[in-house]
């Protein structure tokens, strides 16, 4: 895609008015645009307006809209150039397409306390044989995964990751899938810092000690408040303890995932991760982990192995809120640091 020059505010407003009547909730392709959309400024503005409608985006004034359009256009150029390469994944115009990578990182990334902290938990999955593992695991198909949620601009990924694992093990042990409260962890888990970051095993320790309420009783607010756990009525879900997967090994993590959903961490700050739309993601990314997610399965597609990850950025990101990250065989930190820090709840 050839870069289209920036336009003046007056021209931008004029074109916006011209195309306004024709904009509707279009049926976007899987990546959110077609090559025809790249042929003129008018088509780009129409695409931008359609994208705004699809993602319920509103801007305070024309200056802000023009600023976001320029970022959108730059991201679209990056998406198109990336998708022309022979990758196993593709990018698209998701919810974050009007954010620069710096803005995206400030709002959604870096919400982990140092994930290299070593904890003295049970290490049940150490150097176990992978020969007898099932070829594919998907805990969604077994009814152990609740719908994808959105953490908003609160740095609470650690709470979402932990809660998803507790929901999973509770379903496996009791046969009941219930949605649990991330907000309780944001408000009440004292070693973490609410919307300013946390650490999944601390959250899992909290649940083992105190239990956790239903999401309907303690709903998510995307901001830290006063702990209300003692005032909230209704049932709670409790676990028995916390387990740790020995890090930096594919087999250990696969063994753990085969038994239950697992909290994992990744480096998510890169532009490809921000704009990921589908396929098996293989980078580029580093291993300085900054975001907690949940491994809910694994498998192979087109001969490539992957770990199935549930994220907390809503269903408009990735594969309806999920990402498949390429497996790295043997001993390594894994793609995007996926094997570096993995924990799970235990429940008798």
Curated annotation (Swiss-Prot):
Protein keywords: Disulfide bond, Glycoprotein, Hydrolase, Protease, Signal, Thiol protease, Zymogen
S-S pairs: 154-195, 188-227, 285-336
Catalytic class of the enzyme: hydrolase
Which residues does UniProt assign to the signal peptide?
1-16
EC id: 3.4.22.30
Q: Where is the active site?
A: 157, 291, 311
Q: Where does E64 bind?
A: 157
Q: Which reaction does it catalyse?
A: Hydrolysis of proteins with broad specificity for peptide bonds, similar to those of papain and chymopapain
Q: Does the keyword Transmembrane helix apply?
A: no
From the UniProt record, list the residues forming the propeptide.
17-132
PANTHER family noted in UniProt: CYSTEINE PROTEASE FAMILY C1-RELATED (PTHR12411)
Family, per entry: Belongs to the peptidase C1 family.
Job of this protein: Cysteine proteinase with a high level of diversity in substrate specificity.
> Under what name is this protein listed?
Caricain
């Amino acid at each position: 895609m050839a870069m289209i020059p920036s336009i003046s505010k007056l021209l931008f407003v004029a074109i916006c008015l011209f195309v306004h009547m024709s904009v509707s909730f279009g049926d976007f392709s899987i990546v959110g645009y077609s090559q025809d959309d790249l042929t003129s400024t008018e088509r780009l503005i129409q695409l931008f307006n359609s994208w705004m409608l699809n993602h319920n985006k509103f801007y305070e004034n024309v200056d802000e809209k023009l600023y976001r359009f320029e970022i959108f256009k730059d991201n679209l150029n990056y998406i198109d150039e990336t998708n022309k390469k022979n990758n196993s994944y593709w990018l698209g115009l998701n919810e974050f397409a009007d954010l620069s990578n710096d803005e995206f990182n400030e709002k959604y990334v870096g919400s982990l306390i140092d994930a290299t902290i070593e904890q003295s938990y049970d290490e049940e999955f150490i150097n176990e044989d992978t020969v007898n593992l099932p070829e594919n695991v998907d805990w969604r198909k077994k009814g152990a995964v609740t719908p994808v949620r959105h953490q908003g601009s609160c740095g609470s990924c650690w709470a979402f990751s932990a809660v998803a694992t507790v929901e999973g093990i509770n379903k496996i042990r009791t046969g009941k899938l219930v949605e649990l409260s991330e907000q309780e962890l944001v408000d009440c888990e004292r070693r973490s810092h609410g919307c300013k970051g946390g650490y999944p095993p601390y959250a899992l320790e909290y649940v083992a000690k105190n239990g956790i309420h239903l999401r309907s009783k303690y709903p998510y607010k995307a901001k830290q408040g006063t702990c209300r756990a003692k005032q909230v009525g209704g049932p709670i879900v409790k676990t028995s303890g916390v387990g740790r997967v020995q890090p930096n090994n594919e087999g250990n993590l696969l063994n753990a995932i085969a038994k239950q959903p697992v909290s994992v961490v990744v480096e998510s700050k890169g532009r490809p991760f921000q704009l990921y739309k589908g396929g098996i993601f293989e980078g580029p990314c580093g291993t300085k982990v900054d975001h907690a997610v949940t491994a809910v399965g694994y498998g192979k597609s087109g001969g490539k192995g992957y770990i199935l990850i549930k994220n907390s950025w809503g269903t408009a990101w990735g594969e309806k809120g999920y990402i498949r990250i390429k497996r790295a065989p043997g001993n390594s930190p894994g793609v995007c640091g996926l094997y570096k820090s993995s924990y799970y709840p235990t429940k008798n």
